[in-house]
Regions:
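Juxtamembrane intracellular "pre-TM" segments in multi-pass secondary transporters
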Residues: 1-14, 188-221, 397
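Hydrophobic core of transmembrane alpha-helices in multi-pass small-molecule transporters
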Residues: 21, 89, 100-116, 297-311
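A single, central transmembrane helix in multi-pass transporters
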Residues: 21, 25, 29-33, 163-170, ...
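Transmembrane alpha-helix termini and helix-breaking/packing motifs in multi-pass membrane transporters
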Residues: 32-41, 92-96, 151-171, 239-243, ...
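Loop-to-transmembrane helix entry/capping segments in MFS-fold secondary transporters
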Residues: 45-46, 131-141, 326-336
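C-terminal transmembrane bundle of multi-pass solute transporters/carriers
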Residues: 55-71, 76-83, 92, 240-397
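Cytoplasmic helix-loop-helix junction between adjacent transmembrane helices
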Residues: 106-147
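Helix-loop junctions on the cytosolic side of multi-pass membrane transporters
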Residues: 127, 169, 173-197, 380-392
Length: 397
């Protein structure tokens, strides 16, 4: 499958796509509104960053206890219920006078719910599409999320100029509720991919199985660490330039769209395995220029160019699926998403802490340097793994 026409002719893909777009819009508008609300209340870059990316901090806890449900729950019911739960949480965040501590409690709950949703979504996409359509389909999902971010952050910034953050949160809740309805009406009822009831013990067993393979471990770490550190840079856009954060987020989303389009549509399958390291280096290196405190036009250009590097995730997910049994696809993708989002939350907290002690520009530079170091270290570990495997292969022959 190489064309978008074939992709959208696949039964159920279109409503799945539309619901994902609505959820992306809700996430971007609501996240920007919440970060703005917290920053106005606290004047803290750390709390602003964590409020926007804080749900990610709960992802790994959810992956530890809930992720077996990704393959053991009916996908349609699970996804529509998750979107409805997000609508409810966002309504709570919009309540006037909600204490900051309660805000972070709701944000933590959203992260737990999202840890299950990522696995169900990835597993269902793998089920709806044929094997040769997974990367193209995943790229479309990533691209629409990027486009929705461009529109969502631009719209969110414009809305915040004329409406209160709480009103924007209400709009976000309405989008989540709409997505829930689309999922319920647009998807077919399917049985779970794996037998048995979701449980903590089943989650732990499958996590241990997935983590037992060294190639999978390196693939997971490559998806989690460099990405998470750079999202720490993104979490500082509000404190770097409070009046133009929407422009920077939109520039990042545009770069992400270009990266996903290029990797998913134009790069030959034989070339994709070589892309992750160069793209991850591209993701981090431009942020070093924030040491110069660039103004808005240059900052937006830097962010856009760097975000092309997020296209590495498509090649990494394709490798993960090649290393994973089909019946564990949802769990494997859920663990990937939970770990990635957890590290994004850690990156946001770390970047916010450094910014609190120094400045947002200095913190971005430090996070970029850390991401480059991690990418080069993992690349060296991958080369050692290949060299170690070659004598074993030769001996068997």
């Amino acid at each position: 499958m190489r064309s978008y026409r074939e992709l959208f002719r696949t039964p159920e893909f279109t409503p799945f796509f539309l619901a994902s777009a609505a959820q992306g819009g809700a996430l971007t508008i609501g996240g920007l509104a919440l970060a703005t609300l917290v920053y106005r209340a606290t004047d803290s870059p750390l709390l602003s960053a964590v409020s926007m990316f804080g749900p990610q901090l709960a992802q790994m806890l959810g992956a530890t206890f809930l992720l077996s449900g990704a393959d053991r729950l009916p996908p349609r019911a699970a996804l529509s219920s998750i979107s409805l739960a997000f609508a409810g949480c966002t309504l709570v965040l919009a309540l006037p006078g909600l204490p900051v501590g309660a805000v972070f409690g709701v944000v933590f709950l959203q992260g737990l719910i999202a840890s299950l949703g990522g696995g169900v979504t990835g597993g269902l996409l793998n089920e709806i599409l044929p094997k040769d359509g997974f990367v193209l389909g995943r790229s479309v999902f990533n691209m629409v999320f990027g486009l929705v971010q461009v529109v969502g952050f631009a719209t969110g910034g414009a809305l915040l100029a004329v409406l209160s953050p709480r009103t924007c949160l209400l709009l976000s809740a309405a989008l989540y509720a709409t997505a829930s309805v689309v999922l319920r009406l647009g998807l077919s009822a399917r049985p779970p991919r794996s037998s048995g009831r979701p449980s903590v013990s089943a989650t732990w067993r499958t996590n241990a199985l997935l983590w037992s393979s060294r190639p999978r471990r390196l693939t997971y770490l490559g998806m989690w660490l460099p990405n998470g550190l750079i999202v720490g840079c993104e979490s500082l856009y509000v404190s770097y330039d409070p009046g133009a954060a929407g422009v920077l987020f939109s520039a990042a989303a545009l770069g992400m769209f270009v990266g996903d389009l290029s990797v998913g549509r134009f790069v030959p399958p034989a070339l994709r395995p070589r892309l992750p390291v160069p793209l991850l280096l591209l993701l981090a290196a431009p942020y070093l220029l924030f040491a110069l405190r660039p103004g808005l036009p240059w900052a937006a250009l830097i962010v856009c160019v760097a975000s092309v590097g997020f296209g590495a995730t498509l090649a990494q997910q394709e490798r993960l699926m090649a290393l994973t049994p089909d019946e564990l696809a949802g769990h494997a993708l859920g663990l990937r998403g939970a770990g990635m989002l957890t590290m994004q939350g850690v990156g946001a907290a770390l970047a916010g802490t450094v910014a609190q002690l120094t400045s947002p520009g200095s913190a971005m530079t430090a996070m970029a340097a850390a991401s480059l170091t991690v990418t080069l270290t993992l690349a060296a570990a991958g080369r050692r793994q290949v060299r170690d495997a070659e004598p074993v292969t030769a001996a068997r022959e």
